[in-house]
């Protein structure tokens, strides 16, 4: 089963349904990494000052909102955090509407809702009620410190929550400035009949197994072919990147090592001084680490 990305409850009236949120989509797109063609080293990203062209360190970057042309209002991290909505771990239903009333352009990201063992019956009750009434539930939910408008709807035996775009983020059709040739088209009966006949001839069932991303398939086939021919470039990863990825483990190991060292030194101080001197004479001097010779890369 897919990993839950959020746990909480659906809430409407006095009803609470414990649920977990599972992503209903996955990305299979080709991931192209940037490489320096001269050395096949990975190419990263830098924060560049657009005026001076120089790199800017993270501690010198602040966040600003454009207020007027070339004029910004700067907000601190504390001010930004204070604007985040309080996470309630609930999907708060505030209305039930006909699904046809939700414009297609408002639909954004779907998620599956899986019930907790304690709430399976009431989960099924909400699903069946939505089916019987042909309604969807509108709700507010906070995910990753952001408040979202959402629609909860039935899908076969499950419930789905679809994140909706805020109406202010969706453009009206008036922005297209359609002419009367489109809005009040004068179509003849024969034109309509031929179009309907064409649609009828091309009508088919939804067959998801037959719909493929041909670009993805061709790229991966090309990768497999070139790999089979031995056309593979060795890329040296940045050791600093690996250190950052394992930072938590390194920090924990360092803490444990220092804790053990602290205990060891404390126990040594309790031993007689004479024994300490004998131990110092018997222990060999630490060897200096060997210096590695650097080999230049061919450009």
From Swiss-Prot:
Coiled coil: none annotated. The keyword GTP-binding does not apply. The keyword DNA-binding applies. One of its GO terms (molecular function) is double-stranded DNA binding. CDD domains: KU_like (cd00789). Pfam families: Ku. GO terms for biological process: DNA recombination; double-strand break repair via nonhomologous end joining. Residues 284-299 have a biased composition (Basic residues). Residues 227-249, 261-299 are annotated as: Disordered. Disulfide bonds: none annotated. Residues 273-283 have a biased composition (Basic and acidic residues). Transmembrane segments: none annotated. Residues 10-188 form the Ku domain. Keywords: DNA damage, DNA recombination, DNA repair, DNA-binding. Belongs to the prokaryotic Ku family. With LigD forms a non-homologous end joining (NHEJ) DNA repair enzyme, which repairs dsDNA breaks with reduced fidelity. Binds linear dsDNA with 5'- and 3'- overhangs but not closed circular dsDNA nor ssDNA. Recruits and stimulates the ligase activity of LigD. Homodimer. Interacts with LigD. This is Non-homologous end joining protein Ku. The lineage of its organism: Bacteria, Pseudomonadati, Pseudomonadota, Gammaproteobacteria, Pseudomonadales.
């Amino acid at each position: 089963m897919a990993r839950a990305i959020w746990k909480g409850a659906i809430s409407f009236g006095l009803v609470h349904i414990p649920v977990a949120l599972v992503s209903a989509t996955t990305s299979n797109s080709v991931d192209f990494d940037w490489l320096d063609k001269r050395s096949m080293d990975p190419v990263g990203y830098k924060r560049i000052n657009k005026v001076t062209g120089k790199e800017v360190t993270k501690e010198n970057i602040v966040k600003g909102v454009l207020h007027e042309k070339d004029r910004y209002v700067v907000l601190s991290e504390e001010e930004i955090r204070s604007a985040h909505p309080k996470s309630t771990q609930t999907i708060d239903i505030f209305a039930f509407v006909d699904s046809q009333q939700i414009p297609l352009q408002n639909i954004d990201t779907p998620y599956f809702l899986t019930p907790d063992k304690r709430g399976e019956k009431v989960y099924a009750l909400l699903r069946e009620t939505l089916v019987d009434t042909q309604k969807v539930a509108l709700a507010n939910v906070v995910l990753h410190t952001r408040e979202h408008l959402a629609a909860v709807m039935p899908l076969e035996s499950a419930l789905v929550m679809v994140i909706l775009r805020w109406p202010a983020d969706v453009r009206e059709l008036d922005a297209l400035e359609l002419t009367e040739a489109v809005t009040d088209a004068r179509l003849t009966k024969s034109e309509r009949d031929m179009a309907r006949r064409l649609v009828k001839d091309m009508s088919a069932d939804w067959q998801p197994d037959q719909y493929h991303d041909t670009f993805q398939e061709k790229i991966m086939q090309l990768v497999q072919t070139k790999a089979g021919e031995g056309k593979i470039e060795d890329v040296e990863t940045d050791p600093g990147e690996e250190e950052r990825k394992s930072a938590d483990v390194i920090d924990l190991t360092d803490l444990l090592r220092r804790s053990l060292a602290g205990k060891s030194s404390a126990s040594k101080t309790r031993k007689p001084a004479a024994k300490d001197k004998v131990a110092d004479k018997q222990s060999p001097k630490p060897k200096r680490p060997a210096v590695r010779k650097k080999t230049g890369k061919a450009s």
